[in-house]
Amino acid sequence: LRVNEGDDVEVTVTNNTTLSHTIHWHGMYQTNSWRSDGVPNVTQKAVEPGESFTYRFVADKVGTLWYHCHVNVPEHVGLRAMWGPFIIDPKEPIPIEKEVTKDAILMFSGWNPEVAQEYGKGGHPGEPITYFSINGKSFPTTQPLRVKKGDVLRLRLIAATLDVAFHPHGHDMLVTHKDGLPLASPYEADVIHLSPGERYDVIMRMNNPGRWIAHDHIEHHTSNNGKAPGGSVLVIEYEGIKTDDWYVWKDKAYDADFYYSESMTKGPGIHDVPEHEGTFPELRR
């Protein structure tokens, strides 16, 4: 969902499931609209199967937000992925935002399918997360992020259900916003740490052509049920690089020897981080 600052937002939720739900607009102030905060038995009655509820509020908080179900959060958010991004564009962006040529959202989550099955039998969570994803997909099925040399890329990072340590190869990140709010002093970072519910905006100047990976730096988050590589990994690919599909779903993509040898023959970038002085020298003045 994407709106502009000051818009009157009206969203009608129709419950076509067999469970009760509400929608919480995470990060919204809900000034004079507390009935739309989505907290069951506090601001509203839960929306039961077959019912509808309309949320109405003014988009008075700008930046990267998100929405999620607020009923039985460990199950509905943690296991059933009932969440999504909610972007409110400001009337007056900060100067560096005006340079952005490409905008992308990365939402991080994880789950354990065995626990999800036990929920249906009245079970409870407690087992470790075994699958990790970006925008609902695990590597090597994550959607590649394609850019052009010279792009100014903004990544909106959202930790939906788990801790994240995001790291892109081959490029600097300038951290400009936290939880939707612009920072008084943007700073460079090599790794961004997020806790569940946190959001960061980072800007990257795409000046290092090749094919690179970006991933969660928590080691087991880059696996699928213990098989690596997988999980929270995606490819950043520059326009003009030969577009073969080595990273699409293949059994051998789970083979570490393939990943660290065969993949490196597919163009510069993978595991080849050259020393460079940085993308934002103005911050060092």
Model-derived regions, located:
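Short, glycine/small-residue-enriched coil/turn segments at secondary-structure junctions
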Residues: L1-V9, P140-V152
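Long, repeat-rich segments with strong aromatic
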Residues: R146, D151-F166
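Acidic-aromatic/histidine active-site loop/patch
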Residues: K102-V147, G269
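Short strand-edge motifs at loop-to-beta-strand transitions and within beta-strands
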Residues: E51-F57, Q143-L145, L153, D190-I192, ...
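Histidine- and aromatic-enriched segments that form or immediately flank copper-ligand environments
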Residues: L1-I88, D163-H193, W212-I236
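Extended terminal and domain-junction accessory segments
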Residues: H76-E114, S195, D201-R285
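Short, solvent-exposed loop/turn elements at domain surfaces
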Residues: S20-I23, P113-E118, A165-F166, D245
